[in-house]
Amino acid sequence: MSIEVVKPGLSTTVQDLGRPGYYHLGIPLSGALDQYSCRLANLLVGNDESAAVLECTLLAPELAFTDNAIIAVAGAQATPRINGKDVESNASLAVKAGDTLGFDLMKAGARTYIAVAGGIDVPMVLGSRSTYALGAIGGLHGRKLAAGDRLPVGNPGREARAGRTVDIGLVSSMAKELALRVLPGLYFHRLTESSADTFFADTWTVASEADRIGYRYRRGRALHFLERQQPFGAGSDPSNIVDAGYPYGSIQVPGGLEPIVLLRDAVSGGGYAMIGAVISADMDCIAQMQPNNKARFLLVDMPLALSARAERQQRLVRLRAALAG
């Protein structure tokens, strides 16, 4: 079975849950930016949660099916259409050989996930089918999809069937204004006291430079770092440090001007001070922010971060239970 890419959309890639374990070698996590929506789409079609799906950014693709298949669409609010007719999101759907899947514009959210029963069956690279375009590995030829590509699909499992739905309470909302919870980082103390306050007080806007590597935020007040004699190996700007590792979700502010939250395709280290990190429970939310959406950063402590992670895990438990069988 295969799927033909008629129109690739703005940036459509093959992703699964990622390839942890190689960050120390400079190979990032990759994988779906919105892990929850990826899991939801897979569970709807009876796949293992780790099966490869299509991640579609801002403008979804047009796909033609060469065989009968079971599919599901989750994530951003973009109405799917089979042969031009509106169909449901967050539900498993039957498509027939010769059918075409398309979408309208994403009204809220930035990433839609398309799962096919059997999963997108591209080769595994370092234990994952995820595309890491900067390194040209994984996915389909290590790149985003192009018109004319053919995507191989694995054999559907016994759980594959149309008509499976999920309660709206288990579907992620796509808010256009968010509060992103942040743990202070190793270099938070390098900010002046007033900048530490304004970072959390200001409302920031998602810039157009927002992709799988990182999300840039602007229109808040510039941040100032304490002056110091820069150590050997650090850059000349106070926001520079001697190179250090970058945690997933970490926040750097080059030149003190615009915070950047590093995502799943970010490099593993560099010379900018990490003033904090968005907690893991909120990273899926960033993935669904469109340019010009608004965000506030909210300072939290480790107990709250761990509690939020536990709540997120419980939500996954409820999702699995709702779609079991």
Whereabouts are the PLM-identified features?
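Conserved "landmark" site that anchors the functional core of diverse proteins
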Residues: 1-325
